[in-house]
Amino acid sequence: MVVGGTLRDWEALGEQRWDDRVERLGEVADQAGASFLTLRAFEPGVEPVDLKWWERQVGSCHVIVDPCGDGRQRFAEAMQRLQADEPVNEATVAEALYEPADCEPDLIVVLGASTRLPPSLVWELAYSELVFHPMAWHELSPDDLVAAIADFARRERRFGGLDDES
């Protein structure tokens, strides 16, 4: 998952640059063996922008473009999608939040300072590894995703645990 920019930043990217970005980032994720790559806004921003959710298959990687910059809103919408006879538990909530992806993200690349967590993420922060890149949304390149994947590969996953030195 890559999280960055406001909805206004996303709109400013333009359709052609979006197509190129999805294709190129999808190729990197596909080469790394990822089944899914989700692109999500860091936050909604101050100006309302109406952008649509969309998806594309790039090789074996399903790329999801999710403009929801408010994690609480996304959580509420996921809860509304649950069937009335369905139990509300960690598994059903996770399934509703991640769909069409079939699992939680292993890696979240956050574009921005490491001192601020994205409000677009609520649920994902529990077990995903975060890699911060202090850059703006429009600066993101496939090489940045390659570097984040390499950083992730070097880590020892703690699944929400703390360093031994803490």
What are these regions (language model features)?
Residues 1-166:
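Flexible, compositionally biased loop and terminal segments
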